[in-house]
Design a protein with these regions (language model features):
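Amphipathic alpha-helical dimerization/coiled-coil segments
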Residues: 18-32, 114-129
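Short alpha-helical segments that sit at the start of domains
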Residues: 27-53
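Short, cationic-aromatic polyanion-contact patches
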Residues: 45-51, 66, 99-124
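Hydrophobic residues on short alpha-helical segments
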Residues: 55-57
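A short acidic, leucine-rich amphipathic alpha-helix
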Residues: 69-72, 88
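A short, conserved structural fragment
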Residues: 92-99
Length: 129
């Protein structure tokens, strides 16, 4: 199961610098492409709005063949579904595949993760407050 994590952490820059120093001194390589660290819960909520979460869930569970089909599943306007899908694609959570067929090419959404996790470390938040 492939998991993407949104991590709420106060002072992520300071933590990232500390982690980078540890990695350099230990000779380790650590790049997490499946994690986004943010110090603002408002930003996380804006990035992963309820509409985008619903869209992600529908893609994982229903595996629609097009954005039109996804819009029908969600009962939403296709232009809004496209906008939200483009945001999820820019985050690396989904990809939009061009599928040719009758008429013009369609965009087929494909989930790149099976699960999204929202992580809060209360001790980290309290420590940096």
């Amino acid at each position: 199961m492939k998991v993407f994590t949104f991590k709420y952490q106060k002072n992520p820059v300071g933590s990232a610098i500390d982690e980078m120093e540890h990695i350099i001194h230990a000779g380790l390589q650590k790049i997490k492409e499946d994690e986004l660290i943010c110090d603002s819960s408002e930003v996380i909520n804006k990035i992963m709005s309820p509409s985008r979460l619903d869209l992600f869930v529908a893609i994982v569970e229903r595996q629609p063949n097009s954005l039109y089909e996804l819009a029908q599943i969600l009962g939403k306007d296709q232009s809004q579904v496209l906008k939200d899908a483009k945001t999820l694609e820019s985050l690396g959570l989904i990809e939009l595949l061009e599928v040719s067929g009758e008429g013009r090419a369609k965009l087929k959404p494909k989930a790149l993760y099976d699960k999204i996790v929202f992580e809060v470390e209360p001790k980290q938040v309290a420590k940096s407050a």
